[in-house]
Amino acid sequence: MPIIRKILARQILDSRGNPTVEVDVYTENSFGRAAVPSGASTGVHEAVELRDGDSAVYLGKGVLKAVDHVNTVINDRLKGMFVTDQEEIDMAMLALDGTPNKSRLGANALLGVSMACAKAGAEYSGLPLYRYIGGTMANTLPVPMMNVLNGGAHADNTVDFQEFMIMPVGFSSYSDALRSGAEIFHALKSLLKSKGLSTAVGDEGGFAPNLKSNEEAIELVIEAVGKAGYKIGSSTANGGLGDAQVMIALDPASSEFYDAAKQKYVFKKSSKQELSSLEMAEYWEKWASDYPIISIEDGMAEDDWDGWKILTDKIGSRVQLVGDDLFVTNTSRLALGIERGVGNSILVKVNQIGTLTETLQAIDLARRNGYTAVISHRSGETEDSTIAQIAVATNAGQIKTGSLSRSDRMAKYNELLRIEEELGLQAKYPALSAFRV
């Protein structure tokens, strides 16, 4: 019987050496384990990640309170339930927490249990997790957003924007796309060395050199694509997709350099330039005209709705505009964005909302309204590869899970290789069809 017998949580360490929650779920004849990720640049509207706050232990970042909630109240409530009743399990935990932002039990407690239950349910059913969640039509491998150059909150350097990414859009298989990313990563490393620049990496495995400007960062990435022997696209303003093998994606994480008091975007790490919302939107419009950019995530701050609308009206027909801090994987925030006509894509981070059911609901709402969904990691990760399974389960078509270094990032890429191998001829790589621009 798939009845939950025991739920056991523990405190482990993530890729930044900070505590996080790991959960084991036991039934009579199945088992599931999940570890919870954590972000560095977090949106103010995210569900609450419960930390202990004791500065003498792990600098206040311990998660023993969340662990205790799993081992006591959540365990007591879910014991005896069928592990295969995912929605009922998640709804029971939401009722138990009773707050709109999971602040009582902690989203990190709820998510660990939710994902571990799904894994135990999949094992009981004799199915891989992607098939258990997504059914027989789950067969689309995602186009990766590979974060090869870091700045912003993810690196101690002079670059304001958080992530400069490559997207292999001109390939017929995931494995070939991944190979191109790895080769471009190594070409970029060689290029940086030749210029006397640092090849130290940031939280997500991308390089984090000190550069003269934000423009130099994107130009280095473009140069590395060519150095690796791949064809970079041109600006989408000039119909630049064509036979492109690689396009550029950005995550400036604009909330991180938005000064709410001044209502200005301040380039604190580089030029000290201050831009209004209109000027920031015009900045991205120029970049989208000058460079082969196919996607911009969080191009405006999380509560700058007017700025988001300006940006969407300017370039939303030709560039994927992804809401991360804007939508925080929350159906209410996403519904508001749809109503206001801002963005055209949602970044999906399971720990922003706290349960698998709510995550799937957000993806469904996006899809029904013509928005794409990008399944995403966090900067603080573990060896857990659940998001790779979710990407295939939902046929999302895109995944964002870091650079081509650090085993916490490679765990997801390698899991997708295994899934592609398992699917065989059924496996689909969407390439440019993953985008709706």
Curated annotation (Swiss-Prot):
Its main location: cytoplasm. Pathway: Carbohydrate degradation; glycolysis; pyruvate from D-glyceraldehyde 3-phosphate: step 4/5. Binds a second Mg(2+) ion via substrate during catalysis. GO terms for molecular function: magnesium ion binding; phosphopyruvate hydratase activity. GO terms for biological process: glycolytic process. Gene3D superfamilies: Enolase-like C-terminal domain (3.20.20.120), Enolase-like, N-terminal domain (3.30.390.10). It holds the Pfam family Enolase_C. It is an enzyme of class 4 (lyase). Its EC number is 4.2.1.11. It catalyses: (2R)-2-phosphoglycerate = phosphoenolpyruvate + H2O. PROSITE patterns: ENOLASE. Mg(2+) binds at D251, E297, D324. GO terms for cellular component: cell surface; extracellular region; phosphopyruvate hydratase complex. (2R)-2-phosphoglycerate binds at Q162, K349, R378, S379, K400. Its cofactor is Mg(2+). It is found in: Cytoplasm; Secreted; Cell surface. The keyword Cytoplasm applies. Keywords: Cytoplasm, Glycolysis, Lyase, Magnesium, Metal-binding, Secreted. InterPro entries: Enolase, Enolase-like_C_sf, Enolase-like_N, Enolase_C, Enolase_CS, Enolase_N. The active site is at E204, K349. HAMAP family: Enolase. Belongs to the enolase family. NCBIfam families: eno. Catalyzes the reversible conversion of 2-phosphoglycerate (2-PG) into phosphoenolpyruvate (PEP). It is essential for the degradation of carbohydrates via glycolysis. This is Enolase. It comes from Chlorobium phaeobacteroides (strain DSM 266 / SMG 266 / 2430).
